[in-house]
Amino acid sequence: MLGRPVFGLGKAITSVDVAVIDANSEWIGVKRLQLMENAGRSVAEEAAKLAKPGSRVVVFAGPGGNGGDGLVAARHLAYMGYQVTVVMIVKPEEIRSPETRAMYEALAAMDLTVDIRIARAPADVAPVEADVVIDALLGTGLRGAPRPPYSDAIEAVNSSTGLKLAVDVPSGLNSDTGETPGAYVKADITVTFHKPKPGLLRRPDVAGRLVVVSIGAPPEAEVYVGPGDVAYRVRPRSWKAHKGSSGRVLIVGGSQDYVGAPILAALAAERSGVDLVFLAAPEHVTRAASHHPTIIPVPLRGSPNIHPDHVKKLEQLLDRVDAIAIGMGVGLSDETKEAIPQIIVKALEKEKPVVVDADGIKILGERGIPNSNRKLVVTPHQREFQILFGDALSGVDEDIKARALKAAEKAQRHGLVILLKGPIDIVTDGERIRLNRTGVPAMSVGGTGDTLAGITAALLARKLEPFHAASIAAFVNGLAGALAYAEKKDSMTAMDLIEKIPEALNNPIEAANRVPAYQRLVRGRIEWQPPVGRSES
């Protein structure tokens, strides 16, 4: 067993997680300026524990958000009675963060209590004599070795007298990996925000004593999927992109009785930013899709249903794609029940992530769940969950915590990702649990589950981790549905939802701010255990 799952992004958070939480906090209503104020005040309070009022504190500040945190700390320390000097390593007009600029302007007015030095040349960045030196040069966004003037400032911090306090992460340390490819601050204490960062835990020799503090980011900014997840995890195409480099998806579905489901999944995948979408289905299904010329048909001949004789053809096609969605409208004929597990296993053997939906879930419930090392994503609703795992859930109006923990237990046991659909979607890989609250009641129309499967497969093909792909797909599918509902009301269809996927995916923050406010649906509460406190090196 891997231990008790946590609600949110894990016990430690990456640099991308930090950006996601900041953006989601702002969406909820806690602005970045407020987060910066809280962060800087927390730094000041920790610095005040290291030296008595009247002592000298020097803050080395950069132009980004980390520097802004340091400027806030300087303001609070001046109020507490410390002799405060701020060394700005760039000119004020070069401050790139609007929040940091606002904090600098406030500090610039404090001409009686704060000494500000602008480093206009490398010679202006020199070691200082102080009781506490605060490193607010570079934060979690660092990639590669610091360059001048940052590297010069880092050397100045290390050569200064006094205790070294790093803001969020020591400058020069990669907060995700713990690597130090160039100059880095060797801190005595690091005050990090919200949760520990992996690099800090790996390099106590650089971070020193670790203190985790709250900056007022709501737990919901991490537990609920939000527009920040889309904005910071789904990357736009590179200018160096070529056909296929942004992902290729295979949709396998359809049967004698169901034609539309795999077509909807294919159209949703196409609108989710992949380059190529293949639709493998019985011949009458691919004929029905022929008026969508951008979908590549792969007719499965010889049977009106997916048949074991089709497996070899599909196995060859797997080498040409990056992800697969299977199960939409396949039916439950005996030949299909035999073929579907074979196709899934072949895909997993080739290290292709697989999304299983609808009838595919029912077939796995009967035939068994293959081992996938978390490359398998299943998207059941409540009844399908019971069929797949043989264990009933409490009703959708019951305790969200109980439902989530049961789903996490199944995900952990079987080594897969579960996207449990409902008024509040639950996404879990057995270690982490996230919730999604986008969507509208009108999404009860047929086909919205098929669109969800297609979006998930597309995000997997775009190289997102399965847990994040499923989480973001739930958010985008629900947001697109809400956007469609805003125009069509109860007349909306799954096709209307598909047309809104680009807006939800490409402008998530703006789009999320235009849909009706969330209505509280959750029954019960989750456990949130803040990691605030000290971790000795």
Curated annotation (Swiss-Prot):
Bifunctional enzyme that catalyzes the epimerization of the S- and R-forms of NAD(P)HX and the dehydration of the S-form of NAD(P)HX at the expense of ADP, which is converted to AMP. This allows the repair of both epimers of NAD(P)HX, a damaged form of NAD(P)H that is a result of enzymatic or heat-dependent hydration. Residues 227-537 are annotated as: ADP-dependent (S)-NAD(P)H-hydrate dehydratase. Residues 1-227 are annotated as: NAD(P)H-hydrate epimerase. (6S)-NADPHX 1 binds at residues 150, 168. Its cofactor is K(+). Residues 226-508 form the YjeF C-terminal domain. Binds 1 potassium ion per subunit. The keyword Iron-sulfur does not apply. This is Bifunctional NAD(P)H-hydrate repair enzyme Nnr. Its EC number is 4.2.1.136, 5.1.99.6.
